[in-house]
Swiss-Prot record:
Pathway: Purine metabolism; IMP biosynthesis via de novo pathway; 5-amino-1-(5-phospho-D-ribosyl)imidazole-4-carboxamide from 5-amino-1-(5-phospho-D-ribosyl)imidazole-4-carboxylate: step 1/2. This is Phosphoribosylaminoimidazole-succinocarboxamide synthase. It comes from the Bacteria. Pfam families: SAICAR_synt. One of its GO terms (biological process) is 'de novo' IMP biosynthetic process. Belongs to the SAICAR synthetase family. The lineage of its organism: Bacteria, Pseudomonadati, Pseudomonadota, Gammaproteobacteria, Alteromonadales. The keyword ATP-binding applies. Gene3D superfamilies: ATP-grasp fold, B domain, Phosphorylase Kinase, domain 1. It catalyses: 5-amino-1-(5-phospho-D-ribosyl)imidazole-4-carboxylate + L-aspartate + ATP = (2S)-2-[5-amino-1-(5-phospho-beta-D-ribosyl)imidazole-4-carboxamido]succinate + ADP + phosphate + 2 H(+). It comes from Shewanella oneidensis (strain ATCC 700550 / JCM 31522 / CIP 106686 / LMG 19005 / NCIMB 14063 / MR-1). Signal peptide: none annotated. It is an enzyme of class 6 (ligase).
Length: 367
């Protein structure tokens, strides 16, 4: 099979039994199972959740998004070989480490295939929980233009690009478009402060105001666990985004859990430690791909200016990127995944066929 065949680019057309619409995100698709199938799997697989918990099959793709657009490569390459399996493997590793360190659970109940999670339905917190240990990216761009207050936090004078911050900072933004919150524009990814969340905690999905402290603790503790593990591999954990939600436990109590993915090259910046000590930035995350795009296209403002989205979408749609650029991203993702997990990342020749076979034979979910 060709390289393009080994890439799972379309992941919302699997014949999984469902009575709801398939939710397709930038990278993952979610298939909500029927109530009967959810109850059957909870019973037969022994999942530690209430018997009426809705379950979903979450299938990751190899698509690559940047600047809110999906990009593709030459030769019909619609994604990055190994990217989906690498992201899931990294998240699986960190979630296991979180459990070993006594942190919160995740939404994952089962891992049938490197591309597939079986997850429990959660009530999401509508906050992108962002943690920063170094000043770079959007924080540096704002700081270099003279801004000193970021998400309600006053930054000191004299900071330099890419330097370590005096302390770990929590700089949240909105998840999705939220309306009717005083002082918060109805736009996606708007920076917010802790005081914004406290004053409107229910609008952001928190059940109790005290849970704001818990979310910040889980964010910082999770960051520190990953940062320490990466430091042992001579990698620098620069910044990251976590997501949280509530589930109901066996006793009927709400509990806050980690959702989505954690500590991956898609949701984080990770730098090579040796290069950083030499004053260079060597990205082991999607940031390297973003920088490639900014240098590849003659007018980078199209990628940065939100007022030019139609041009940006056309740019992504009409331009196949060089194969070597796509393969460099593949090497970045699989390389950091193998460092983190200590295991090779599987690259199935036909992932879609493999997924269907497993979900049919071991879970009876294929129609």
């Amino acid at each position: 099979m060709s390289l393009a065949d080994s890439v799972l680019a379309v992941n919302n057309d699997l014949p999984i039994r469902t009575d709801k619409s398939v939710h397709s995100g930038k990278v993952r698709s979610v298939y909500w199972l029927t109530d009967a199938d959810s109850r059957r799997l909870i019973k037969t697989k022994g999942y530690n959740v209430p018997e009426d918990t809705p379950l979903a099959i979450m299938v990751i793709s190899d698509r690559i998004s940047a600047f809110d657009c999906i990009f593709h490569g030459e030769g019909g390459l619609k994604g990055i070989p190994g990217k989906g399996a690498a992201l899931n493997a990294i998240s699986n590793h960190w979630f296991k480490l979180f459990a070993e360190n006594g942190l919160a659970d995740s939404h994952i109940l089962d891992i049938p295939h490197p591309f597939v999670w079986i997850v429990q339905k959660a009530r999401p917190i509508k906050v992108e929980a962002i943690c920063r240990q170094y000043i770079t990216g959007s924080m540096w761009r704002a700081y270099s233009k003279g801004e000193r207050v970021f998400c309600g936090i006053t930054l000191p004078e004299g900071l330099e690009k890419d330097q370590k911050l005096p302390e770990l900072l929590i700089t949240p933004s909105t998840k999705g478009i939220l309306t009717g919150i005083p002082g918060v524009p109805a736009q996606d990814d708007v920076n917010i402060s802790r005081s914004d969340i406290e004053a409107n905690y229910q609008a952001f999905g928190f059940e109790k105001v005290e849970d704001i402290d818990l979310y910040e603790k889980l964010l910082k503790d999770g960051f520190k666990v990953i940062s320490k593990a990466l430091a042992d591999l001579d990698q620098v954990f620069v910044d990251t985004k976590f997501e949280f939600g509530y589930v109901t436990d066996q006793d009927g109590n709400s509990k806050l859990i980690y959702m989505d993915e954690v500590g991956t090259p898609d949701s984080s910046r990770i730098w090579d430690g040796a290069a950083y000590r030499d004053g260079k930035i060597l990205e082991n995350s999607k940031e390297g791909f973003r920088q490639f795009l900014l240098n590849h296209f003659p007018d980078p403002d199209i990628l940065l200016n939100k007022d030019r989205m139609p041009e940006r979408e056309a740019l992504a749609r009409d331009n196949a990127l060089p194969l070597e650029a796509m393969m460099q991203v593949s090497r970045t993702y699989t390389g950091i995944a193998e460092k983190v997990t200590g295991a090779a990342i599987p690259l199935p020749a036909n992932p879609k066929a493999d997924i269907i076979k497993i979900l049919r034979e071991e879970y009876d979910l294929i129609v």
